[in-house]
């Protein structure tokens, strides 16, 4: 089986239709040798200082450096900041799909952000399967089929990921620098 990950449910459904994955499951579609699933945008974020057990940031802690790990995106609730339950549930679906497949296709947006979204999930879930990149800028049947015929190894997009990840870490530092 081959997993395809998109960053939006509607994109996932469109790609699933074209590749023949017509059977609807909870959070993914399957068929034609594919399992197509999706995220709801960025479901992961760089960890906050509190995630490492630090209750509050002191002046001595500056400059802050982003921790090298990711956490599930938090949402503001009545009881404070808690993991986004929809993200947690869909991450379980994505993990199940990835575990059932021997190849993963990154079909997130053809951009730095789309590449970072995929790489963060791939790393967060501890994936070891080979990954390929579907690079398309249109959801027409022709564009999807041409993209599927011209998949490229993910490592060819390493610099795109590094650019987005560097910007993400710089944004983290900028947000955390305000006391």
Residues covered by each model-derived region:
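Intrinsically disordered, low-complexity regulatory segments
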Residues: 1-177
């Amino acid at each position: 089986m081959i997993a395809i990950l998109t960053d939006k449910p509607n994109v996932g459904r469109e790609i699933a239709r074209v590749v023949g994955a017509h059977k609807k499951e909870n959070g993914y579609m399957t068929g034609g040798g594919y399992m197509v699933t999706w995220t709801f945008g960025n479901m992961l974020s760089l960890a906050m200082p509190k995630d490492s057990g630090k209750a509050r940031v002191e002046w001595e802690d500056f400059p802050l450096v982003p921790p090298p790990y990711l956490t599930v995106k938090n949402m503001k609730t009545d009881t404070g900041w808690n993991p986004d339950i929809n993200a947690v549930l869909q991450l379980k679906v994505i993990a199940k799909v990835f575990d059932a497949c021997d190849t993963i296709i990154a079909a997130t947006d053809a951009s730095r952000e789309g590449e970072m979204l995929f790489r963060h999930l791939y790393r967060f879930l501890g994936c070891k399967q080979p990954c390929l990149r579907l690079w398309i800028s249109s959801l027409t049947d022709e564009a999807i089929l041409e993209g599927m015929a011209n998949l490229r190894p993910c490592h060819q997009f390493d610099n795109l990921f590094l650019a987005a990840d560097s910007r993400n870490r710089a944004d983290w530092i900028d947000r955390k620098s305000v006391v």
